[in-house]
Each structure stands twice: as C-alpha cells, then as structure tokens.
Amino acid sequence: MEEESIKEGSEKPRGARTADKAGWIKKSSGGLLGLWKDRYLLLCQAQLLVYENEDEQKCVETVELGSYEKCQDLRTLLKRKHHRFILLRSPGNKVSDIKFQAPSGEEKESWIKALNEGINRGKNKAFDEVKVDKTCALEHVTRNRVRGGQRRRPPTRIHLKEVASAASDGLSRLDLDVPDSGPPVFAPLSDISEDQPQEPPRALMPPVKPSPGPETSAVEDSKETPAGERALTPDSASSGANPESQEDAETPAKEDSDVKSLPNSTLSEKLKVSWENPSPEKPSAPESAQLSSSETPEATPRESKKPPAPPPKILSEKMKACMSGVDASGSSQSSEAPETTSPEPTQVSVNGMDDGPESALQAMGIPGPAPEDAAASPALPFSDLPSQFHPRSSSLGDLLRESPQHPRLPKEKLYRAQLEVKVASKQTEKLLNQVLGSEPPPVCAESLLSQAVEQLRQATQVLQEMRDLGELNQETPGLVQKRKELVTLYRRSAP
C-alpha cells in the first residue's frame, strides 16, 4: 500500500494533463480465480484507457463508457473494507462487468463520480457532437473579403450634412413626382373642354329617333299599310260604297295610333294569321276602285317596319287531331255561309278565300293555316308580296278572270277527307272503349295465377302458425297427420 501511495504521489505523466482523471487502481481480471492487477487508468471524456505503467506506451484495454449503465459500490458478503466498485453494463450490450479496487474510500468515491460522468457523456455523445457536412456548408458573406490595413474613418460633419441634404432633396423630388405618377386629371379635362364644341364622340352614340314632323308622318302614313290591316278593311267595305270613302281617310290615322301604342306581342290573332298566310288575302274590288293615289303607297314602308315573316309552321299530328273537330264544324258553317249571307259571287273572289277551313278558323280567331299547301310551303317574305297583289288599275272583270288561277279545290277535298277519316277513327275508338268498359273483364291466366299464389301464401302462413304452436305444446301423431292432410289439401287446391 505504501508503494501505491508513493506511485500516486509521484509526478503525473504528460498524458494525464489532458485526461479528466488518472491514477493507479487494481483491476480484476474477470476470471474464475479473480486475480487483481495494478493498472494505470486514464479517463478521457467517455473512454477509460488501461495501461501497465505511467509511460502510456502500451495500452492494455480501452473501455467505452457509453456501453455501461452506471458505476456503483461493490458490496460483498464479507465485511472487509476493500473499497471496491463495479461498472455495470447496460442491457443489450455484449460487454462484461468490470470490477475495480481503490486504495482508499475517498479515492473510490472520486472514481465512481468520475466514471458516472463519463458514462453520461458517452450516452449523450450523439447529442453533443455536431457534424457539419462540408459539401452543404454555406459560404460566409464577408469572411473571404480582403481586409484593409486600417479601419474605416468615421464620417465627418461635412459629409453628414451632404448626405442629409441629398436625402431631403430626394424626398422633395419624390413629393413632386407623386402627382405625375397618379392618374391624369387636369390635362384630359382641358382637352375635352376644347373639343366639346366639335362634338365628334356623339357620332358613336346610338342614334336617337327624332319625333317626326307632320309632313314626314303624313308621308310615312301614306307609305305604310300592313297586310294584316288590309285584311281587316274588307269587313267594313261590305257595308257600302259611300261610307267607305269616309272611313278610308279615318282608318289610317287610327291604325297608326293603335300600332304605335301597342307592341307587336299584343296584336290580334287576325293580324298574326295575316302575317303567317298573306297570300290568300286580296283587296276588295270596290275598295281598290275607290282608293285614291295617295292611299295606295301606304303598304310598302309599313311592311318593312313589321317583324320578318316567321318560319313556316308544320303542324304536328296532335295539333291536326285537335283542330280536326274545329275544321269539321267550320267547313259546315262555311258551306252554309255563301247561300245566306253572300248572294253575290264577287264577295268570295274579292276576299280571296273559298269555303275552306281557314275561313272558319279566322272567324273563330284560331291562328293556323287551313290549306295544306300553305302549311307545307314556307311563308313568302314581305318583299315578294306586292308582286302577288293585283294592280290597282285592274278592273273587276280582271279579278274575276284571274281568280281561278289558284286551283285549291282538289287539295281542300283531300284535306277534308283526311280530317273526316281521323274524326271517324277517334269516334270508333271511343265507342269501343265504352263497350269494353261496360262489359265484365274476361277471365285471364294472370288473375288465376294471382289467386293461386294468394292461396299458397295463406297455406304457408297457417303452416307456420301450427309449427309455432307445436313447439310450445307437444305434438301428437294425430295432429301431425292432420297437418299433413291440410298441406296436401292446399297443394291440390293450388293450380
């Protein structure tokens, strides 16, 4: 022991200066015999270096303290004061426990404390070390700059004044530049005020319709007379020749006021019919003879202002079937009309309409072309209408002579025949439905099958109820036989 104390009192080697703790300690060999040998231990951070002597030339063992759990006092069965301590390994590491023996109790406590600190450093080694990859390192901004020999002189007072004046000058310049950067306000207003008397932009505005003077309105009224209004005038022409001359002068002004006040969507049904089928309507002979030269040009400009002719209406089968009843009644009324109301044949030719379904439809106010050729052929544009009307200079004989140029009797007869066939077929269907509705429904296979299915369902329901009762009460052989007979009975009754 004295030798050990002498060794400890001797000077520490040069390697011990960098170590956390160094000294001579007895270390167990770990064998069965448990031999103890003096070793020079050197604690560096998280490593324990074991040497044979203080020269630190031959390292016998290197212990990584991170693989151990803790260092504590070793208690033996014998109560001798050996001052021993042990390094306990952490679970999961394939290292063995190491036993040491210190020369004194104080030395033992100091080594236990130092080794525990080394173990903690080994455990936290991953957190303490900061590894910086050189490839990912960012270059410093000013580290590689060339440094001058002297430091920069502080700015003088004159320099500060110059900087302040330049800054104030720049701010004033910015203030002056603000209006220029904003939207131009004064220059465009002056330009507009100078250009106002010329008024060139007004040409781009949509043209405002000026109120027409008395002369222009008279000219336009003399030029405009729609075909629909012309179709209305023959009704008043049948009253007499003298009142027509007085009413013809009054009707244009009234019609103009009515047309201007009412939009196109609120026109009467007769006007719509006249627009869709303008060709069969012609002016009356007495009216054409009595109209003055000033009233004749009223038709052309008014027609130009009217909306364009709608596309031809092709009646569907449902529409024709709905109108068939009206056409049949209209044809019977129109056949009786020429015998009673029109004794003269001139009225039929003047109106340009024969005993067709259109006369009945127009009298009842139902829009729709009656002749088949008018329904199938597209409506002629209003620009071609003046060519179809007879000239005003033609006489009554010319009108009567040219009237048979439009052969419509065969087509009208065919149309009537088709309508009669449709009406007859509909009436037959109605009668057949009434007869079938009054008779009892015949026995069919579906009703028999449904009855059989219902009987089978009732049988299965009764069988299920009997099964439930049989589970509660003990079934006798007689009940089982009855149930079988009942099932067979239901099966036989089912088709």
UniProtKB/Swiss-Prot annotation:
Q: Which InterPro entries match?
A: PH-like_dom_sf, PH_domain, PKHO1/2
Compositional bias, Low complexity, is annotated for 324-335
Query: Pfam families this protein is in?
Result: PH
Q: In the record, what lineage is assigned to the organism producing the protein? A: Eukaryota, Metazoa, Chordata, Craniata, Vertebrata
The annotated region (Disordered) lies at: 171-411
Keywords attached to this entry: Coiled coil, Phosphoprotein
Gene symbol of the encoding locus = Plekho2
Please identify the protein, giving its name as recorded: Pleckstrin homology domain-containing family O member 2
Enumerate the spans annotated as PH domain: 18-120
